[in-house]
């Protein structure tokens, strides 16, 4: 069987780089794409100059302003980013029809059998990066491997403007030293739990039996067992249509307080808005997910007359669904029982199957 050749291409600080390209006065300066510095908006993108101060995507703009008070804040121009993204996708399609765009600024290509009959994936990756720069004046990083998991990890290895190739025989040696927190599917809470179990790196994860991992992480334990060995059979899906998108947050401590939980719900709504904008997605059906301290799970949904994607609309709709889970205790509004996780997702009303990646960890 032919060894798969998968490329993951990820644009470097995409939104911020587009702004620095279009407005030369921003070049070389810490630039933050998002809302005003004194708002509850989150950072959509940060230039590498801003990242040196600790600014990261999804961070509240107010915190970013504290870390980098000299930074320039600009509002996102999503229509411009979408046009550039189309240019990038057109380049991908010159090599293969097996292109899976994950967002405006990144995608997978399966070039095992490609249109130009180029035998080496690394050659294609080099050509694509060169062509992207020629047509858009933007840089991209790329990773080459035999699976989605490996190629994505590889693309993150030498950013910005880097290329990393992981040969099949080198997969284990590549994974072993990496922190598990860098693995897709390992969020902050899971990474913390893994550390409590003595799992810090890919090698640590690989020493655990499948039974141990399932015991601690449920069915996700099987996934962790496989990726620690570089096993990922997911195909590049060129025709994938996203039906839903959301985010969830697991708390360090279970929560009862109404006001505290509303703040957490607002934070989730803000992150969902950012992801919806990045994926160019809107939907009519909002689903609220609540997991209690005893791991019991409740979901409630509401279908609206028009598609929504803004944080305030998500938040106000989620609150309506949230109210039934509260009661007045000793004159104070509290949850009916302690809550450990909140999630919000948005989907089309005709979605029959829930996207397995519907709720992504914050």
From Swiss-Prot:
GO terms for cellular component: cytoplasm. Binds 2 magnesium ions per subunit. One of its GO terms (biological process) is SOS response. Keywords: Cytoplasm, DNA damage, DNA repair, DNA replication, DNA-binding, DNA-directed DNA polymerase, Magnesium, Metal-binding, Mutator protein, Nucleotidyltransferase, Transferase. Pfam families: IMS, IMS_C, IMS_HHH. Poorly processive, error-prone DNA polymerase involved in untargeted mutagenesis. Copies undamaged DNA at stalled replication forks, which arise in vivo from mismatched or misaligned primer ends. These misaligned primers can be extended by PolIV. Exhibits no 3'-5' exonuclease (proofreading) activity. May be involved in translesional synthesis, in conjunction with the beta clamp from PolIII. This is DNA polymerase IV. The gene is dinB.
């Amino acid at each position: 069987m032919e060894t798969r050749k998968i490329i993951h291409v990820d644009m470097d600080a995409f939104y911020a780089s587009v702004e620095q390209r279009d407005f030369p006065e921003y070049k070389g300066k810490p630039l933050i794409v998002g809302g005003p510095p004194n708002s509850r908006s989150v950072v959509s993108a940060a230039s590498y100059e801003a990242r040196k101060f600790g600014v990261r995507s999804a961070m509240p703009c107010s915190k970013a302003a504290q870390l980098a008070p000299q930074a320039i804040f600009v509002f996102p121009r999503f229509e411009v980013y979408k046009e550039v993204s189309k240019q990038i996708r057109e380049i991908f399609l010159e090599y293969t029809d097996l292109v899976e765009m994950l967002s405006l600024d990144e995608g997978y290509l399966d070039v095992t059998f490609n249109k130009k009959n180029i035998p080496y994936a690394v050659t294609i990756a080099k050509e694509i990066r060169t062509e992207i720069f020629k047509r858009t004046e933007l840089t991209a990083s790329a990773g080459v491997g035999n699976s989605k998991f490996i190629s994505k990890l590889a693309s993150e290895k030498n950013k910005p403007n880097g290329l990393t190739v992981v040969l099949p025989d080198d997969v284990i040696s590549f994974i072993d030293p990496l922190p598990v927190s860098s693995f897709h599917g390992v969020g902050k809470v899971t990474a913390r739990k893994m550390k409590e179990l003595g799992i810090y790196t890919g090698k640590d994860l690989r020493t655990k039996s499948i039974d141990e991992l399932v015991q601690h992480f449920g069915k996700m334990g099987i996934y962790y067992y496989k990726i620690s060995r570089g096993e990922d059979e997911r195909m590049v899906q060129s025709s994938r249509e996203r039906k839903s998108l959301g985010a969830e947050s697991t708390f360090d401590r279970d929560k009862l307080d109404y006001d505290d939980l509303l703040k957490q719900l607002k934070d989730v709504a803000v992150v969902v808005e950012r992801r919806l904008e990045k994926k160019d997605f809107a939907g009519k059906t909002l689903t609220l997910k609540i997991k209690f301290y005893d791991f019991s799970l409740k979901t409630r949904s509401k279908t609206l007359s028009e598609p929504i994607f803004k944080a305030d609309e998500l938040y106000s709709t989620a609150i309506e669904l949230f109210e039934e889970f509260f009661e007045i205790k000793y004159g104070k509004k509290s949850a009916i029982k302690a809550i450990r996780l909140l999630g919000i997702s948005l989907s089309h009303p005709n979605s029959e199957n829930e996207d397995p990646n519907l709720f992504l960890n914050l």
